[in-house]
Amino acid sequence: MFKILIPARGGSKRIPKKNLVDVNGKPLLQYAIETCRKITDNVYVSTEDNEIQAFVESMNVNVIERPDRLAQDDSTTEDVVEHFLEEVDTDLFCVVQPTSPFLNFNSILDGMELIDGKLEYDSVISVCKEINYYWDINGKPINFELGNRKRTQEHE
């Protein structure tokens, strides 16, 4: 059965409690939960934070209590996934970052179709092309020519 993991650490250093920060009237984490619930009720939030846990439980979502050792600045998503797989029985799962409030559930469904369909993929990852322009310390363009820079809508 397909399950979704949302890793939601409480100890962000740059933006304290970022997963609970209000974004247009809702905690950031709520956007991810609502998107995932359009696909399945088998949504799990991994957290070490009591406030996040209480919020998740108030939404009737499964909580995986993350050990403190997996909630450090150097902890990786892979470590959290491994812990999730030790706790939850599943053959097919998806990781959704709570810091992507504009994620469309169709993107998740498209990825599931690639894995669960006739194609022989065992994993997929979503990416988006990022266009950045860089200047050196003297203000000289590094990866474009002044006066000859494409507008963002002109990129493929």
Show the residue positions of the predicted features.
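Short, high-confidence coil segments that cap the C-terminus of an alpha-helix
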Residues: T40, T90, E120-Y121
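Conserved core of the sugar-phosphate nucleotidyltransferase
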Residues: D79, P101-E156
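Histidine-centered beta-alpha loop that forms part of the nucleotide-sugar donor binding/catalytic region
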Residues: R9, D68, Q97, C128-K129
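N-terminal glycine-rich phosphate-binding loop and ensuing alpha1 helix
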Residues: F2-T47
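Structural beta-sheet core signal
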Residues: I4-I6, V45, V95, S123-S126
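Short phosphate-binding loop-to-helix
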Residues: Y44, N50-C94, F102-E113
